Every structure is written in structure tokens, then in C-alpha cells.
Amino acid sequence: MKEGIHPDYRDVVFQDMSNDFKFITRSTIQTRETIEFEGASYPLVKIEVSSESHPFYTGKHKIVDTAGRVDKFRKKFGTVGSKTSVAE
């Protein structure tokens, strides 16, 4: 393998924001946040859904608050880039 071209592959903590579940895995993801976990400091990645909170794995239906995202997007960007018909 060539030297200096591969990203840093390291231990990272992923935190499920819906239930505060944390787990360590290895990743090349870059993050500015860190967390103390099991007596050591690790980079932290916050995620919305993990196997601890996803209905497929838990067997329970859970409503995730995502309402209003489309409206928020439309309010922010309006009709920028939308196709309009040209009258001939």
C-alpha cells in the first residue's frame, strides 16, 4: 500500500440521540467532538437511529419527530431551481 494516502482508521463512539445508546466501532469518519467512554477519550458521532432504536430491530413502533422538514426546506429555499412552464 502507498504511504500517506489512506485515512486514519480509528475507534469512534457512535451515540444514538433518540435513546442515548452509545457503542464503539472503527471508522474513518472525521469529527470535532470527543467523549469520555469506558475510561478513554474517543471521537464522537451523533446519529438519529441505530439498531437500539430502529423499529425493525426493536419490534416496537416508534414515532420519530421529522414533521416539518419539507416545509422548513421549502420556506428556506422557496422555488429556487424549480421548473416553470414557458408560455408560447
Swiss-Prot record:
UniProt xrefs under SUPFAM superfamilies: L28p-like
Keywords linked to the UniProt accession: Ribonucleoprotein, Ribosomal protein
Signal peptide segment: none
Keyword Transferase among UniProt keywords: no
Gene Ontology molecular-function annotations: structural constituent of ribosome
Superkingdom classification of source: Bacteria
Gene3D superfamilies hit by this protein: Ribosomal protein L31
GO cellular component terms given for this protein: ribonucleoprotein complex; ribosome
GO terms for biological process, alphabetical: translation
InterPro entries for the chain: Ribosomal_bL28/bL31-like_sf, Ribosomal_bL31, Ribosomal_bL31_B, Ribosomal_bL31_sf
Pfam families: Ribosomal_L31
NCBIfam families assigned to the protein according to its UniProt record, in alphabetical order: L31, PRK01678.1
Family: Belongs to the bacterial ribosomal protein bL31 family. Type B subfamily.
Name the record gives this protein: Large ribosomal subunit protein bL31B
Gene source species: Janthinobacterium sp. (strain Marseille) (Minibacterium massiliensis)
